[in-house]
C-alpha cells in the first residue's frame, strides 16, 4: 500500500497483456486510480495469448552470444530455423541488428544474464504472492522445467551453461538420459535419441492468457477502468511532458465517432512491440523490435502419455507445456517486421515443423495432424518485443509523465508479475529491491504524486 509520502495518482496504462495488467493490478493495490486502454475486446489477446506457458526463471539466456552471428547467417535460408533474420528495407531492423551484434560477446552475455535472472527471481516471488492472494487458477504445474539434448556437442555445452548460471544463483543441474526419463517418462519412446539434459525443479508453467484475463477481472472489481476495443491515436506532448492521450473506439459504425482525450498524472506504455513506434512519436527512441514467434496447441489423444514437466527440446529450440487437456508447443523467432500472417510459405513451414516434431517426440500422444490432413491444431503467432540485450525497459522516460514497461522478448510471462510490481513501486517513488537497471531511477523527473531522488 502507498504510505504517506506517496500521493495517489491517476494513471493510464496502454496495453492489456500480462505486463499491462500486472502493472494495473499493482498500481490499484497501492490505491492509484487506473485506466487501461487496449485495442482488443479483452485482455491478453495478442502477445500473451498462446505463448509457451513457461515461468522460466532458470532458462533465460539472452539470444545474443558469441555464437549467434554465425548461426544467424547459417539459418538465413532455412524456413524452420530457430532464429530467422529476414532482411527488410527497414532502418529500425538494421539498427536493432547492429546493437544486437554489439552484445554478442562473453562480457555482455554475463552482464545481461545477471539482470535477467534478478528480474526473473523477483518476478517469480511476485507471481507466487499474486496467486496466493487472488486464488487464480490457470492450469498451473509446479513440476520444474527440463531441457533435453540430442547431440553430444550441445550436451557438453550445456554443462558450461550450468556452471555459468550457478554463478547467478540458478539451481540448474545436468542430468543423464536415464535421470531425465525418470523426471519425465513421457519421452521414453524418443529416449534413444536423447543424449542427456538439464533440469530445474523451481520453475513452473501455466496459461498466461487465462491468468492475465482473470487478473484483469479482479482489477476491474477493485475499481480499475478498462477501455477495451479502443485504439491509441497519439500521445499529446506539451512542453517536455505528456499532457494526454487521444483514443478512439474501434467499432464506430458508419456514422463514425470522434476521438476523445484522456488526461492523467502518469502514462505507462506497455504495448509490447508496438511500444517503440508509439514512443518515437514523442521523441523516445528505444530499441524494441518485433520477434515473430509461433505456437501450436494440440488436443491430447492419450493424456496419460503427455508430459507433465514443461520441457525444452534443444534440437528445434521449442518448448512444450501441458495445459489441462491440450499440449502447448511454441518456439522459433523470426525478425522480419510486424507481419502476423500464418499463411505465408515461411509461416506454414514453421507451424508444420511444430506438428512434425511433436509427432516424432511423442508419437500418438497428440492429434498433430495439420489442417490439410484433417486435423485442428490451433496454430498461432505473436510478436515478442525484443531488445538487443533481452533486458526489458522498465521505468521513466526522459519525457515527463511518460513511463514504459516493454521489451520483455520471450520472457513476458516469466517477468510479468515482477515488472508490474516494479513499475508500481517506481511510480510510487520507491526503488524495487533488485539489481536491475531501471530507466530514470538516478534522476527521475518530477511528477505529481512521486518523489524525486
Each predicted region: which residue ranges?
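Central helical "cap/lid" subdomain
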Residues: 40-46, 237, 243, 247-307, ...
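Active-site lid/adjacent beta-loop-alpha segment flanking the redox-cofactor pocket in flavoenzymes
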Residues: 109-112, 129, 133-137, 284-289, ...
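N-terminal Rossmann-like FAD-binding beta1-loop-alpha1 element of flavoenzymes
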Residues: 9-36
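Short beta-strand to alpha-helix junction loop
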Residues: 111-124, 147-157, 198-218, 227, ...
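Glycine-rich FAD pyrophosphate-binding loop
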Residues: 29-49
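Dinucleotide-binding Rossmann-like beta1-alpha1 core, especially the glycine-rich loop
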Residues: 50-177
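C-terminal catalytic lobe of FAD-dependent flavoproteins
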Residues: 172, 202, 314-315, 339, ...
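Helical element adjacent to the flavin cofactor pocket in flavoenzyme catalytic cores
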Residues: 156-168, 187-265
Amino acid at each position: 500500500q502507498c504510505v504517506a509520502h506517496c500521493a495517489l495518482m491517476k494513471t493510464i496504462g496502454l496495453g492489456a497483456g500480462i505486463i499491462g495488467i500486472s502493472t494495473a493490478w499493482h498500481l490499484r493495490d497501492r490505491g492509484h486510480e487506473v485506466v487501461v486502454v487496449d485495442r482488443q475486446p479483452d485482455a491478453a489477446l495478442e502477445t500473451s495469448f498462446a505463448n509457451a506457458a513457461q515461468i522460466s526463471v532458470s532458462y533465460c539466456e539472452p539470444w545474443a552470444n558469441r555464437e549467434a552471428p554465425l548461426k544467424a547467417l547459417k539459418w538465413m535460408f532455412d524456413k524452420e530455423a530457430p532464429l530467422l533474420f529476414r532482411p527488410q528495407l527497414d532502418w529500425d531492423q538494421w539498427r536493432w541488428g547492429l546493437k544486437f551484434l554489439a552484445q554478442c560477446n562473453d562480457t555482455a552475455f554475463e552482464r545481461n544474464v545477471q539482470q535477467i535472472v534478478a528480474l526473473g527471481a523477483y518476478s517469480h516471488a511476485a507471481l507466487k504472492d499474486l496467486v496466493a492472494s487472488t486464488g487464480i487458477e490457470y492450469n498451473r504445474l509446479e513440476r520444474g522445467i527440463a531441457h533435453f539434448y540430442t547431440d553430444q556437442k550441445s550436451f557438453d555445452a550445456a554443462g558450461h551453461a550450468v556452471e555459468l548460471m550457478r554463478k547467478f544463483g540458478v539451481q540448474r543441474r545436468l542430468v543423464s538420459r536415464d535421470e531425465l526419463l525418470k523426471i519425465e517418462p513421457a519421452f521414453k519412446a524418443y529416449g534413444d535419441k536423447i543424449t542427456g539434459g538439464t533440469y530445474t525443479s523451481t520453475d513452473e508453467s501455466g496459461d498466461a492468457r487465462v491468468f492475465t484475463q482473470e487478473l484483469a477481472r479482479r482489477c476491474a472489481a477493485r475499481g480499475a477502468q478498462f477501455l477495451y476495443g479502443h485504439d491509441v491515436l497519439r500521445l499529446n506532448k506539451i512542453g517536455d511532458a505528456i499532457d494526454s492521450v487521444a483514443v478512439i473506439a474501434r467499432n464506430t459504425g458508419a456514422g463514425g465517432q470522434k476521438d476523445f482525450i484522456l488526461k492523467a498524472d502518469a502514462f505507462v506504455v506497455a504495448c509490447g512491440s508496438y511500444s517503440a513506434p508509439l514512443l518515437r512519436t514523442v521523441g523516445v527512441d528505444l530499441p524494441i523490435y518485433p520477434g515473430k514467434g509461433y505456437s501450436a496447441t494440440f488436443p491430447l489423444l492419450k493424456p496419460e502419455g503427455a508430459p507433465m514437466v514443461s520441457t525444452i527440446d534443444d534440437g528445434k529450440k521449442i518448448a512444450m507445456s501441458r495445459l489441462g487437456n491440450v499440449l502447448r508447443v511454441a518456439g522459433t523467432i523470426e525478425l522480419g517486421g510486424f507481419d502476423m500472417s500464418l499463411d505465408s510459405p515461411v509461416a506454414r513451414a514453421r507451424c508444420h515443423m511444430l506438428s512434425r516434431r511433436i509427432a516424432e517426440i511423442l508419437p500418438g500422444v497428440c492429434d498433430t495432424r495439420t489442417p490439410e490432413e484433417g486435423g485442428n491444431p490451433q496454430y498461432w503467432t505473436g510478436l515478442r518485443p525484443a531488445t538487443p540485450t533481452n533486458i526489458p525497459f522498465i521505468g521513466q522516460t526522459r519525457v515527463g509523465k511518460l513511463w514504459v514497461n516493454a521489451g520483455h522478448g520471450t520472457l513476458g510471462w516469466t517477468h510479468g508479475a515482477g515488472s508490474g510490481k516494479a513499475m508500481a513501486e517506481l511510480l510510487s517513488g520507491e526503488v524495487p529491491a533488485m539489481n536491475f537497471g531501471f530507466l530514470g531511477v538516478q534522476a527521475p523527473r518530477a511528477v505529481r504524486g512521486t518523489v524525486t531522488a
